[in-house]
Regions:
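Short, basic/glycine-rich phosphate-binding loops at helix/coil junctions
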Residues: 72-83, 132-136
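Conserved SAM-binding loop
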Residues: 36, 110-113, 192, 230
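Hydrophobic alpha-helical core bundles mediating ligand binding, dimerization, or RNAP-core interactions
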Residues: 44-48, 80-83, 121-124
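Short hydrophobic segments within beta-strands
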Residues: 31-32, 113, 193, 213
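Short, acidic loop-to-helix structural element flanking the phosphoryl-transfer center
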Residues: 85-112, 118-122, 149
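Conserved Rossmann-like nucleotide-cofactor binding loop
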Residues: 35, 42, 118, 198, ...
Length: 254
């Protein structure tokens, strides 16, 4: 039997949260390219050409699968150079400054989870968002990258948002599985904002609500099962958060 649910958060408007049964938003995680800045999708074609791979092949998966550390570093540097060239022409997304100013006024924590390396991220923040704090910033140096939820869960844990994890038992001696820890990050009170299927899938798998920043290229993700809410400009989030976030209805098995 399917139950209909929707992701909700209490209003950020001062005084309004007391009248809401919805959980309070604890923070927002942002993608970078196509989210904080306008898409530079031409980079991906240049990267694949430099690496000699088809469009269907994930760029980072290909690099990490190369047989030696030297080959991996050579390939990684080739795509870093493409990103360095592109960052000079970064353009802020419409509504970027307004949204960040609002989140800072409402004391909403902000983090970044991106498949970029650190230089383009630092360039964007220095050029368009000087003085606005993003912490932590997860770049491609953190593995595994999106669509794996690990980066978002790491951010949640760094903010003190954790939940207990039951130890998995195995073997005749009922020995705890190797690597099992007592707690893990809990992203259920976070929002992931992005423009790609990797963003939506990572957010959903982490347990966060997801917001798609829609454009002409990613319109096919508007109705995707991993997308909770859709905006066309970043500052469209302001009235949504102020009055109370409410995602679309989702059917789940019970």
């Amino acid at each position: 039997m399917a139950a209909v649910t929707r992701r909700q958060f209490a209003p950020l408007k001062p005084g309004a949260a007391a009248n809401s049964n919805a959980p309070r938003l604890k923070g927002i995680v942002f993608d970078v390219d196509g989210t904080l800045c306008e898409p530079q999708t031409y980079m991906f074609g240049e990267m694949r050409q430099a690496l000699g791979i088809a469009k269907s092949v994930d760029i980072l998966d290909h690099i990490y699968a190369l047989p030696t550390k030297e080959a991996q570093e050579t390939a990684m540097e080739s795509i870093r150079q493409i990103e360095r060239n592109a960052m000079a022409s970064q353009v802020a997304q419409p509504g970027l400054a307004n949204l960040m100013s609002y989140l800072d006024r409402r004391s909403v924590r902000k983090g970044i989870c991106t498949r970029n390396f650190d230089a383009p991220v630092a360039h964007l923040l220095g050029k368009f968002l000087e003085g606005s704090l993003f912490e932590p910033i997860i770049t491609r140096d953190f593995r595994p990258p999106k669509p794996d939820p690990a980066g978002i869960l790491h951010i949640a844990r760094s903010w003190g948002l954790v939940k207990p994890v039951e130890s998995q038992r195995e073997g005749p001696g009922d020995k705890a599985a190797e690597g099992t820890q007592g707690v893990q990050g809990d992203a259920s009170e976070l929002i992931m904002v992005g423009d790609s299927i990797d963003d939506m899938t990572a957010g959903r798998r982490a347990g966060a609500a997801t917001v798609l920043l829609a454009n002409d290229v990613n319109a096919h993700l508007i109705d995707h099962e991993h997308t909770d809410l859709v905006i066309r400009r970043l500052d469209e989030l302001i009235p949504i958060l102020e009055e109370g976030f409410s995602g679309r209805e989702l059917a789940s098995s019970t």
